[in-house]
Structure formats: structure tokens, C-alpha cells
């Protein structure tokens, strides 16, 4: 509902994320109404989402792009194909037509002074199949002034070592300061792939609360955000827009989403799950009572979580 979307958006804004992708204006009544309302975010830039223009029409005459323009958001994110297999099978157009659709769509929003992002759908699969064409797709958006070009592992089958290798090659074509990563969790590597991409040069991560998303989900912001503050390899190299004091709100933010979805929270989520700092075995409990660092990689209070000692027949 509208009210639910506003609660989630408010929680993300209070957390301090840089961008909030509010949905697809024109795709359904809820998203359309959400963008018709006025939002006074303190920290986040509201972003609308859509797809590149259709073949056979100009950007100015594309109804989908018009709905995005009329949403009056400062930032716009469009998804477009970057795998030639998808261009042929899913869209049924030529590779050249797809490049034109990307280029003209990007030009349309950049000309209107929008902060433009291009989600290169299936980029990693596209790169593995036809690197020259995949790179030409992201270059088409970047050359027209895209602020961000996001490399999407849409099928979720790419592994961290592949992400690192491919991103390193991409940064030779598009600067890392203009690149982002959009990872799916189909191999359980969405967070790992996101971190690998950052270490290889990208500077935007797309993710969701609790990893909510299609199939196996997306990169979990509730795992990524604290990693950038609490793990030295990242805290010593990178700064993010979120203030360090706000990470204590991560657990509440995680549980708010589950409450809105009316589902039982996943107690085994890293950092924010109820079991993340829960100790049951006798050896573990004994050591934790002497010093929590024996079985805890961080202080749970740093992310708003709590330690839990479970009494059972395994406690000793």
C-alpha cells in the first residue's frame, strides 16, 4: 500500500541511504500514486524506475518515459538490455536498435537535467557471451551523460572471482566512480559479489532491506552497510553517505519490513537476525560469558541487536 511504501521510504531516509528507488510510475496504481505525493526526504534522493524507450518511437513520444518525466523526481533509473541474446529473444530487435534505445533514452533525461542511471540488465552474462557488445551498451549510456552505469547480475549466477575480473576490465571503459553493482542471490553470493565489485572499482551498490527481491533475492543492505563500518578492509578505504551513528537502527529497520510484510523475521540473517548473537552450546556460552569476542565478530549493540543466551540440554 501507499502507507507501507512511505514507511519503508522513511526508514531508509532516516538510515541515510543515498538513493531510494520508489517504484515504476505508470506500472501500477500504487507506484503512480506514490510519486504523485510530495516527499520531503532529509538524506535520500528519490529515484523513479522504468525501462529504455521502445523501438520505432522517439524518446519524446514514449509513454513510459513520459510517465517517468512527469514523476518530477531528481533522479531517474532506466533498465536496458546488455546481453545480445536477450536483445534478440526477449526484445526481438537488432543489436543496433537496442543501442539507439539506450542512447536516446539517456540523452532525453540528461537533457532534462535529471541525474540519470542506467541499469545494464544481464550485464555479466552479456559480457561473458559477447564482451564487445555488452561494453558498447554501457558506453552508449555513459557517453550521453549517465551519472551511474549499474552492472547487473540479473540471473544471479556470476561468482565473486568473475565479478572482480569483469569489473576490472569494465573500469578501463567507464570510470569506477560512475559504476554500480546490482547483484542477485541465486548462488548465495549477492553480498560477496557486491563487495568484490567495490574492491574492483565500483562506487554504487544497489540492494534491498533483508535482501528482498525476485527468486532468491537481492544484495542485503542489512549485511552490506555494517560491513563498510565494522570491517577494517572496507572502513579504512571507503566512505558511505550513511552516518556511523545510524547503523544502530539497522535491526529495527530490518524488522519493520517483516512487520509490514506480515511475515516471520529470518532469525539467521547476518548482523540483524535474532540468532546472529544467540549462544546455546556449552563451550560457546562459557566462553562468551568470559569475553563475548570469543564467539562474536562484533558487538551486537553496534547494529541495534542483542546477545541471547539460550538455556538447553546443550548448555552444560
Can you name each region flagged by the protein language model?
Residues 1-20, 35-37, 41, 54-179, ...:
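Alpha/beta enzyme core
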Residues 6, 135, 188-191, 218:
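Glycine-rich phosphate-binding loop at the start of an alpha helix
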Residues 8-13, 226-228, 232-316:
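A mid-to-C-terminal "edge-of-domain" accessory segment
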Residues 24-25, 95, 124-127, 156-160, ...:
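Hydrophobic alpha-helical scaffolding
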Residues 45-50:
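A glycine-rich helix N-cap at a beta->alpha junction
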Residues 163, 216-223:
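Histidine/acidic-residue-rich catalytic or RNA/ligand-binding cores of hydrolases
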Residues 182-208:
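Small-aliphatic-rich amphipathic alpha-helix that forms the alpha element of a beta-alpha
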